[in-house]
Amino acid sequence: MFEIRKATLDDLSIIRSLADIVFPHTYREILSPEQLDYMMDWMYSDENLRRQMIAEGHLYYIAYKEGEPVGYVSIQPEGEHTFHLQKIYVLPSCQGCHIGKRLFEKAIQVIKEIHPGPCQMRLNVNRNNKAVTFYERLGMKKVAQGDFPIGNGYYMNDYIMGLDI
């Protein structure tokens, strides 16, 4: 059985435990161990996850396969007609099983529920991440690129991709 459920503050440890596996797996060949550690704390400490959900309006959804958490997606309203797909990750053992696509589709569904009119979903993705082709297959287009400082002398070297909804 497969389901996607909206996360609450009670689910922070689930998100963090998934991130502890998927984030290093995704970026181990792209980022230094030091930058990985910095970014894990910056994005996934309990304090920062709580801030994202309460103060910044992130909506997290967790995918479950046979009752076990296997991935998550986070979207955030960003302006009047734009939403940012902040995070979408699936456990390595479940990649290739269409869970990422289903999480992506869930993000679009939620955005349409919040904003029934035309809008855009954007995301940042590391230029060296194989996920670029995943997003392109789902209809996203590169709209910009940049090197964005995130603190401690680190940068995110990203494409910004967009999809009209």
Where are the regions that the model predicts?
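Acetyl-CoA-dependent GNAT
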Residues: F2, K6-L12, S17-K87, L91-S93, ...
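Flexible, glycine- and charge-enriched loops at secondary-structure boundaries
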Residues: W42, C97, Y154
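Conserved glycine-rich acetyl-CoA-binding loop
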Residues: E68, L91-E105, P118, N126-T133, ...
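C-terminal "cap" of GNAT-fold acetyltransferases
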Residues: G117-V132, E136-I165
